[in-house]
Curated annotation (Swiss-Prot):
This is Glutamyl-tRNA reductase. InterPro entries: 4pyrrol_synth_GluRdtase, 4pyrrol_synth_GluRdtase_dimer, 4pyrrol_synth_GluRdtase_N, GluRdtase_CS, GluRdtase_dimer_dom_sf, GluRdtase_N_sf, NAD(P)-bd_dom_sf, Shikm_DH/Glu-tRNA_Rdtase. Catalyzes the NADPH-dependent reduction of glutamyl-tRNA(Glu) to glutamate 1-semialdehyde (GSA). During catalysis, the active site Cys acts as a nucleophile attacking the alpha-carbonyl group of tRNA-bound glutamate with the formation of a thioester intermediate between enzyme and glutamate, and the concomitant release of tRNA(Glu). The thioester intermediate is finally reduced by direct hydride transfer from NADPH, to form the product GSA. GO terms for molecular function: glutamyl-tRNA reductase activity; NADP binding. Pathway: Porphyrin-containing compound metabolism; protoporphyrin-IX biosynthesis; 5-aminolevulinate from L-glutamyl-tRNA(Glu): step 1/2. It catalyses: (S)-4-amino-5-oxopentanoate + tRNA(Glu) + NADP(+) = L-glutamyl-tRNA(Glu) + NADPH + H(+).
Length: 435
């Protein structure tokens, strides 16, 4: 088996270069077609995310002496399809083969190679990449589901999916918050029994607020307010979130939002504070001092620190969240060690399956070859008999030729073992013959 993965990721390349080598769906289909036409691989899966672009190629016909040239061809194709000079890729492009490639794919799918350790989204992206490749081969060849990606590459990806599921089940790799937005939402779940009946106020409309909104909506929040200086940006964010449970406020309406909110998460670029002690005091009077969580992620801060003096106000800053994140990252690091052990086990299991498959293929090929020899000699013998030749003579010739032809390949193998000094192989061969 020859599986090659080549690619770049957030560790090896800048955002600018990663953008250049990204595959749109249309470009991905074109790439799969090119690889097939150039005979670079029998089957290919292309993974393209904001943090990585990787091409997984399977070519079972590559011989050891052809390997280096094949890799060069694949790299040249990768540069050509993205219209990039090879020199621009030299320090950024990595490639792995066979066992290293299998381990790498499993690490990627389990989130061990991600920007955020253990992030779960990558598994869905790997599954989607595999599904797109399957659909391409089905359409390209006009065949049913039985004739798609090569069995080796298919088995590898199926094994990878089950490995990722096992890692999620048996370790805590995805349990703890390791992003500021997620940590803020996790605090809310710790302080309040349920988020579903709470009113949430988000101040700002940037990436962190978007992530926080997605987390909250995923946990069933039914009333979400977004306050932002520029209404157009808030509207654009609401359009992306596609939820009917969001209300937009202007900053002049911020006090109204505070009067209702059980959780406030603020992340703006304002040079001055937006939420003062007096505003929170008024809000708490309106709220009859029900508990409120204020998470100030902004730098400089959006919320006056003195609000901690108010009753039932839980106030956290970005530094507090960073401490939580650092602790959680430490926990994920421990879980990642367990995940690596699981990956090593599953990788070994995949190669054990591959050995059995290759042995079965070898045996089947040898038996088919032997049957072809038998059929050829049998036809000749039958023709000789029909011509009235001696049956004893024909049977003797048939059996002698059959023996010589069938023993030719094993004899060559034994001669090679002798030349290579493979005494163990010869001993195993001899023990089988004696049986």
């Amino acid at each position: 088996m020859t599986i090659l993965v080549l690619g770049i990721n957030h560790k090896t390349a800048t955002v600018a270069l990663r953008e250049k080598v990204a595959f749109s769906e249309e470009k991905r289909l074109s790439a799969l077609n090119q690889i097939e036409q150039l005979k670079l691989a029998q089957s290919t899966v292309i993974l393209s995310t904001c943090n990585r672009t990787e091409v997984y190629l399977h070519n079972k016909f590559i011989q050891p002496e052809q390997n280096s040239a094949w890799i060069d061809e694949c790299v040249a194709w990768f540069a050509a399809i993205h219209q990039i000079q090879l020199t621009d890729l030299q320090d950024c492009l990595y490639f792995y083969q066979n066992q290293q490639a299998v381990t790498h794919l499993m690490r990627v799918a389990c989130g061990l190679d991600s920007l955020i350790l253990g992030e779960p989204q990558i598994l869905g992206q790997v599954k989607q990449a595999y599904q797109l490749a399957e659909e391409y081969y089905q359409r390209a060849h006009g065949l049913g589901k039985s004739a798609v990606i090569s069995s080796e590459l298919s088995r590898l990806f199926q094994k990878t999916f089950s490995t990722a599921k096992r890692v999620r089940t048996e370790t805590n790799i995805g349990e703890s918050a390791v992003s500021v937005a997620y940590a803020a939402c996790s605090l809310g779940r710790q302080i309040f029994e349920s988020l579903q009946e709470l009113t949430i106020l988000l101040v700002g409309a940037g990436e962190t607020i978007e992530l926080a909104a997605r987390h909250l909506l995923r946990h069933g929040v039914k009333k979400l307010m977004i306050a932002n200086r520029t209404r157009a940006r808030a509207e654009a964010l609401v359009a992306k979130l596609e939820s009917p449970f969001i209300e937009i406020l202007s900053l002049s309406e911020l006090q109204d939002g505070l009067n209702q909110a059980d959780i406030v998460i603020s992340s703006t670029g304002s040079p001055t504070t937006l939420i003062s002690y007096e505003m929170m005091k008024q809000a708490q009077i309106q709220r009859r001092y029900r508990p409120v969580l204020i998470v100030d992620i902004a730098v400089p801060r959006d919320v006056e620190e003195s609000i901690v003096k108010l009753d039932s106000v839980y106030h956290y800053t970005v530094d507090d969240l960073q401490n939580i994140i650092n602790h959680n990252l430490s926990e994920r690091e421990k879980a990642s060690e367990q995940a690596e052990e699981i990956i090593a086990e599953e990788c070994a299991a995949f190669f054990e399956w591959l050995k059995v498959r290759q042995a079965s293929n070898l045996i089947r090929t040898y038996r088919e070859s032997a049957d072809e020899i038998r059929q050829e000699l049998l036809e000749k013998a039958q023709f000789s008999l029909s011509q009235g030749e001696s049956a004893d003579k024909i049977l003797d010739e048939f059996s002698t030729k059959l023996m010589n032809k069938l023993l030719h390949s094993p004899t060559l193998v034994m001669q090679t073992m002798v030349k290579q000094g493979d005494s163990r192989g010869l001993q195993n061969f001899l023990s089988v013959i004696k049986k």
